[in-house]
Amino acid sequence: MLRSIQHVEALSSRQISTTSMLLKNRAGKTKSTSNRTQLLTYEMAQKPHHIGVRKSWLTWHSQNLEEFRQSQPLVVAQDEVVRRFIRGFFPQNLVVSGNEIVIKRRGNVLIVAGFLQYSRRLDIRRIYWMFGFAEEFLSILLKQPVKLEMAFVESEEDVAYNYI
């Protein structure tokens, strides 16, 4: 009898919450720094619920078509392979630490878009060779055509939309 009374008292005290609400529902919101030094690109500045309106070019894909459907784990693995290869093959030229690499699928073609930082040491022949090698290597590795659509910028400040 004594045990059941203690059990009932414990349950009744658990139902009353005396803490204040924290309202931690801020998904997709980047934290601001004290002296506004964190770089924010246009895509990072948009809120997650705008992805279908303002960022629709990031969501165009053909995975919902019957002929081009692939399993989700395969797509995630392919995306990770492509991102790691681009980060490893262009280490000095990445902008915003490679977070702005966009991978689009159109039919069976994989399109990799993003920004690379221009360096004075890079000549045109080497750039064309690196792009051709990266496209060919990824095409052979993934067994589907891969196209690189990389744009060169002078510095990371050219890509910056805002500083927070």
Curated annotation (Swiss-Prot):
It comes from the Eukaryota. The keyword Ribonucleoprotein applies. Belongs to the universal ribosomal protein uS3 family. Its main location: mitochondrion. One of its GO terms (biological process) is mitochondrial translation. GO terms for cellular component: mitochondrial small ribosomal subunit. The keyword Mitochondrion applies. One of its GO terms (molecular function) is structural constituent of ribosome. InterPro entries: Ribosomal_uS3m (IPR026146). Keywords: Mitochondrion, Ribonucleoprotein, Ribosomal protein, Transit peptide. It is found in: Mitochondrion. This is Small ribosomal subunit protein uS3m. Component of the mitochondrial ribosome small subunit (28S) which comprises a 12S rRNA and about 30 distinct proteins. It comes from Caenorhabditis elegans. Pfam families: MRP-S24. Residues 1-23 form a transit peptide.
